[in-house]
Amino acid sequence: MSLLDHAVSSGVIDLDKHQPLLDDRVHLCERAGIDPDFMLLAMDESVPPEAVSYVQAYRKLGRNGINGCAITGSMKGLTPMFSRMIGSYMRNFVDANLCSLEVAISPGWRHRSVLMIPDFWLRAKSEHVQGQMLSLMMEREGKQTVVAVADIEACINNCGPVMRDLLECYMVVER
């Protein structure tokens, strides 16, 4: 059974609803920064239940004062996990993108509805990069940003009280 056949039989893909996405799957996934197979894969046990709930509640989050999700704890296997989450967003016609912090802080990326950054804070950053991180998070208020933060307290200690205030509006998911 092909991956597409499995996605259809398991209910991940509804051909009536998703055919336009499937017709342009390679291009859309390339733009989103994920392998095209992830559009056909459900979120599985690699995605914590709280993160699944976060993705499913996407349309209500901004109204409830949640600006994003901070994934903490183990940083192992983040890219495939984030890719499955993006695949789910894409199946719901949400403009989502997976990119590195370096790309996220460059011009042109901040407009995406959902931005997922698996290397947001893995270790201390220079003051210049800290400023760009804070600017990115402030500019993205009202849009959803998913960041990987190896240690929230260390991130706050390194980046200061503004980062603490920004992260207070994020759902924290421990892996």
Model regions: which residues?
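Post-Walker A helix-loop "phosphate-sensing" segment adjacent to the P-loop in P-loop NTPases
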Residues: 85-99
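Glycine-rich P-loop/Walker A and Walker A-like loops and their local beta1-loop-alpha1 context
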Residues: 45-88
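Conserved P-loop NTPase "ATPase switch" module shared by AAA+ and STAND
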Residues: 95-129, 149-150
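Short loop/turn elements that form and flank the Walker-type P-loop nucleotide-binding site
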Residues: 64-65, 109-111, 140-143
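Residue-level preference for the first positions of well-ordered beta-strands
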Residues: 66-70, 114, 145
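A short, basic N-terminal segment
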Residues: 1-60
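A generic local structural motif
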Residues: 56, 102-104, 132-135
